[in-house]
Amino acid sequence: EGKIIPQIYHGRTRRERHEELIEYAVRGGIAQARIAHEMAGGKGRIHANILWEMGGAEHVIEGVLSGAKGLIHGVTCGAGMPYRLSEIAAQHGVYYYPIVSSARAFNALWKRSYSKASDMLGGVVYEDPWRAGGHNGLSNTENPLSPEEPYQRVAALRKLMRSFGLDHVPVIMAGGVWWLEEWQDWIDNPELGPIVFQFG
């Protein structure tokens, strides 16, 4: 259901059209947040999900968070190394949830910027490079043809998070989670700490 809104460009140059597209994305994000808020009757939490390497990502999320103030509670972000995510989220008083595929990636994010806004870190989403459809990366030291078990990678992530005082922050296992029975040994596991699952 719904009404298709045609995308009509008025700009003549590529730059002008790009700016129009960003504004269109901002308006769309605000509209979606309002619809979700109304459908939920103001109950529950609404999170935005953005691809960091998308053109104009920072402008889009800044615009959406400004225009939908109080409606969005968290921002999940991956597809790249979203260094500025913590700063943007903190400025708008929302939690941030970076998507990483290794402890190494989180270490870089933490040291460069996340440590400055640690109180707004709502969780760390782990998407396994071999199970999550291949849209997240491996480092040059990892072999794409030799899958590693996600348990050891998440345990390494948790160990690193503990060294930063983040034992209370949940890890969200995402990508390749279809049956909770396959993950029973992860639940209430002291090595992994607080963990939740995103199915799919």
Can you describe what each PLM-predicted range is?
Residues 1-164:
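Active-site entrance/lid segments in N-terminal catalytic domains of soluble metabolic enzymes
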Residues 138-199:
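Catalytic alpha/beta core domains of metabolic enzymes, predominantly
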